[in-house]
């Protein structure tokens, strides 16, 4: 985890992330900051960063249970990609969606 975020950390925890091409679900340690969403292979100091998502490039986050037919899932949408995640329970799902959505709204306000 050498690329530690320098921004304010808002939430950390394990989420399952759906892979882009094979649509496999892999457990990732995620870190949400006020500017990024990071996904790592684990919590070890040398864990690989598998995703760095700049929140200013995101347009929305929403629950995705109906779309994916999987409990506690949500999506983070950019102009050209959709990232899917699965939380352990409804509370975690709501926490992640709310915190990411708050940051997206904050990014919009900062632009004006």
Q: PLM features: residue spans?
A:
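Eukaryotic intrinsically disordered, low-complexity regulatory regions enriched in serine/proline/threonine
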Residues: 1-12, 44-45, 62, 67-73, ...
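Short, surface-exposed loop motifs enriched in S/T, G, D/E and P with embedded aromatic residues
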Residues: 15, 58-60
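Canonical pleckstrin homology
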Residues: 21-27, 60-112
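Polybasic phosphoinositide-binding surfaces of eukaryotic membrane-targeting domains
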Residues: 7-51, 96
